[in-house]
Design a protein with these regions (language model features):
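Alpha-helical transmembrane segments and membrane-interface helix-loop junctions
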Residues: 1-173
């Protein structure tokens, strides 16, 4: 039963990485376009700034969930690492509990934010509901909660395999 859950979390993690990666690439394309139109064409496009803000929301919440799962989030493990085994596990459970509370906060208030802004539109994108732009908040919170559950039930995901010594880097030596 836990193996399918782990595989589902692996797939969800990669989905987060792809979504956040695409958002980052698009931000990296939109911002230079805004600079180009403003300073080279002397006619600033109105859409790049709000588009970059929307993509930043996507990048932030999907990227944060993915980083949490891989353990790439900010933490202070030095002092916890100095504790004996039993207190270290207790602190770990407290941390996971606090992460679950944060995830539930994101889901609860994110849904309320989406609901409150659903009928509003963005001036530069009149076809797009403001509520839709805030959907990454509750979705990211739900994904984060699933990753917390995974850590509590199964433990952290295994480290990805490292590149073998005879990998691509060896070809350039």
């Amino acid at each position: 039963m836990l193996r399918p859950f782990r595989r589902a979390m692996d797939a969800l993690y990669w989905l987060c990485v792809v979504i956040a990666g695409v958002a980052l690439v698009l931000i990296s394309a939109v911002i230079p376009w805004a600079v180009f139109t403003r300073y080279v064409l002397n006619s600033a496009a109105s859409w790049p700034e709000p588009m970059a803000v929307l993509l930043t929301i996507v990048l932030t919440f999907f990227g944060a969930a993915g980083c949490y799962r891989r353990g790439l989030h900010m933490n202070i493990g030095f002092f916890v690492g100095m504790l004996p085994e039993r207190p270290r596990r207790a602190v770990g459970l407290v941390v996971e509990g606090l992460m679950a509370v944060m995830a539930l906060f994101m889901v609860n208030w994110g849904i309320k934010l989406v609901d409150a802004t659903w009928d509003n539109t963005i001036a530069d994108f009149p076809f797009l509901s403001v509520g839709v732009t805030y959907l990454p908040i509750p979705i990211g919170g739900a994904i984060l909660l699933l990753f917390v559950i995974e850590r509590v039930l199964i433990g952290p995901p295994p480290e990805p395999p490292t590149e073998p010594e005879h990998g691509a880097a060896a070809a350039f030596e």
